[in-house]
Amino acid sequence: MKNKIISIIICILMFIGVISISACNLTTVDNRSDNIVILYENDVHCVVEGYSKLSAMKKELNETYKHVGVVSGGDYIQGSSLGVISQGEYIIKLMNLVGYDAVTLGNHEFDYRLERLEELVNMMDTKPICCNFNAIGEDEPYFEPYSMVSYGNVDIAYIGITTPTTISSSSPTQFRDENGEPIYTFNPNTLYDIVQNNIDSAKSAGAEYVIALSHIGYADDAIYGELEDIETLIKNTDGFDVVLDAHSHSVIEEKLIIDEGGNEVVLSSTGTKFEYIGKLVISDGEFDTQLIKTSEYQKTDTAVDTYLEQINSEYSELGKRKVGYSEVD
């Protein structure tokens, strides 16, 4: 009888142990930081090698942070023969492999004409945003003006803004009809109001933070209509928390600009051609930006590297094609 009781006790203890182990397995604690990290780039201009490092950095940070995103300030599909040969397709496929949360349009996204841009948009996993481009006579923008992305229980709105000088700097005939009359506009004279309306709309939709992906910059050709440069845009609007800028290839790690409402706005830009990768950390309403020298980051992503090898091989084969000959020595 005594042995039977001991056996029963042992069985009960073993059963309790199994339940305890199972419970431990089911309640694994995620000790990663709740801070939000946004990696950003601008004006890459087809320097495709940087995408592998960007993807690797995203994955590495995701080991420490629960919420890691990637965004672009535009001018990614133009800048080298890789872009020209594929009419931007190689670049879009690379960006899909990295996985972007939001992208805007630079002036050079229109270089292959609007019809081709529409084809590329259909290939994109993340559709571009641009609040200030529309057909004349239409109230709605041609592309979605902003996108809302959830990071845990925090909603961030990204608003896309493209330089109004695109109308004259990127295949200008595509923006006019056969009679030379304008049929599209980037709204140079009402830009501040358009941007402000979208800030207000995003906040009404529940955005806790609002970030601009602006392709404006400080370039000499940025003066068009009421706009002088990115700082005048910030000073004439109210509600941005962070502005990630592009177009002038400026290197700005962090600059504080006071907006129309008297609030500090963080301004940053990564230069061009993946010279830097930007890192924005959001922690309880605080915003910190830093620039990481891409050449000093050594990790790469295997999947992106594999595709880079593929497109380089295709590019090499295309370069061997005979397109003509000359009888002149």
State what each model feature region is.
Residues K4-L26:
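Sec-dependent N-terminal signal peptides of Gram-positive bacterial secreted proteins and lipoproteins
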Residues T289, Q298-D329:
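Hard-cation-handling environments
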Residues M1-N3, D30:
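Generic cytosolic/nucleocytoplasmic N-terminal low-complexity/intrinsically disordered segments
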Residues I6-S7, C11, R32, T64, ...:
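N-terminal hydrophobic alpha-helix used for membrane targeting or insertion
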Residues N25-T300:
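Acidic, metal/ion-coordinating pockets
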Residues G17, A23, Y65, G180, ...:
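Short, flexible coil/linker elements and helix-boundary hinge sites characteristic
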